[in-house]
């Protein structure tokens, strides 16, 4: 089956917005740290709850924290410690795009994920 892919930005945005859940995981991958990259012979992997990530871009660049939640609909991550203060003084989590983070420690509680990553044979 041939997939026709458009170059047009509006159609690219529409495809991301209307993507089914089983393909949204592709948008939720992030770069691995140099140490993990060498260990697993892989450059990127899907971010899951429990991974430790370092924010590379934006106001929170340099902050490191554990992923508290992964928002499949918005394709965003909620990282522990990345908070903004509202006008009334309450703090709320600031969602981060997966392309702006680097995975520094993997959550390997899922044996299938560990097997899929391999040990760098």
Swiss-Prot record:
InterPro entries assigned: KOW, Rib_uL2_dom2, Ribosomal_uL24_CS, Ribosomal_uL24_euk/arc, Ribosomal_uL24_KOW, Translation_prot_SH3-like_sf
Domain of life: Archaea
Pfam families: KOW (PF00467), Ribosomal_L26 (PF16906)
Region (Disordered): 1-30
Family: Belongs to the universal ribosomal protein uL24 family.
NCBIfam families xrefs: rplX_A_E
Name the record gives this protein: Large ribosomal subunit protein uL24
